[in-house]
Amino acid sequence: MFQVEAFFKNIILEDIIMAAITAAMVKELRESTGAGMMECKKALTETDGDMEAAVDVLRKSGAAKVEKKAGRIAAEGITRVASEGNTAVVVEVNSETDFVAKNAVFQEFVQDVADKALKASVDKAGDGEDVCAILDMKSDLEEKTIVIGEKLSLRRFEKLTGECVASYIHGGGRIGVLVAAEGATGDAVKEALTNIAMQIAAMNPQYISRNDMSAEELAKLREIIEESALNDPATLPKPILNKLIDKAINDKVWSDEDIATYEEHKSNMQYLFNFLSKEAASQLAELALADRATITADKIFNGLVEGRVSKQLKEICLMDQVYVKAEDGKQSVAKYIAEVGKAAGSEFTIKKFVRFEVGEGLEKKNEDFAAEVAAQLQ
């Protein structure tokens, strides 16, 4: 009898507590914590409507959620910049999905990270360093992880200071660029630097100029281009290619079928490799590699390699690149800078640039939709 009475008393008590928890209370708790509506209602019920105690309950459960998300891969996200005077910073903060990267709460958080990084005592952090600890944002990160519901990661930041600094954000934050210059200043130079930042975002140079490359880097580039040419006999100078073909025929390296194909199409060497077997082309490459010393000493071959090295340098060195806004489609970035400097009455030079592209170098998680749904239901 007493057990039945106690049971009904508990039900009545729960109803009273539930009735006392108003929609306004749930809304207030949601706004202060960012937690879901049902989580807020449950926390208020557990604490008999005590707002501070409910916040503690959500924090404790949230901490568990943060720990659970820690093992996930965060390779999406955005970049943001902040600047003050002649100093600017670019940051990259990662999320698990590009959907979250478009979230206003996440974007506001990343801007807060940029503002904090601008005032940091170090100019650069990342590559395994604890950026979160450096910026003293551990609690902020945990809070946003709870609110957003995904693993978030403060990956890296870098600051630049110069006589003139410009920034550019591309694709809603997919790429963030900083450029610092020394020499002339003013609105025209600032505009030119912004244009150059756009150039860097689009063309992804690796160096400011070829003078910034070490002798070892240039030698390595040449070696790669030589190796590529030897492995692709179709692109070799005609005299060298003819010698390799003669050797393939005379030494019976080629099959009778490939020799017959060559005899049929040798009058039009430009299309020969469209008809030769893959095996025949591979055999020519092997012959070229075996005769590397002779071929690499050939003046014609060296001319080909130098041409390809020069072309590659025009792609990876900012000053050598064709300026993306060039009206004639030919003007280099170096000539554009000289033109702006002349008009400004004083020269300026690029001191340094930083380019962050979201997720570069990070592992990305690939799951099919069914697997993703199944994982969420577990």
Which residues are covered by each model-predicted region?
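Aromatic (phenylalanine/tyrosine) cluster motif
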Residues: 2, 7-10
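Accessible peptide chain termini
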Residues: 1-2, 18
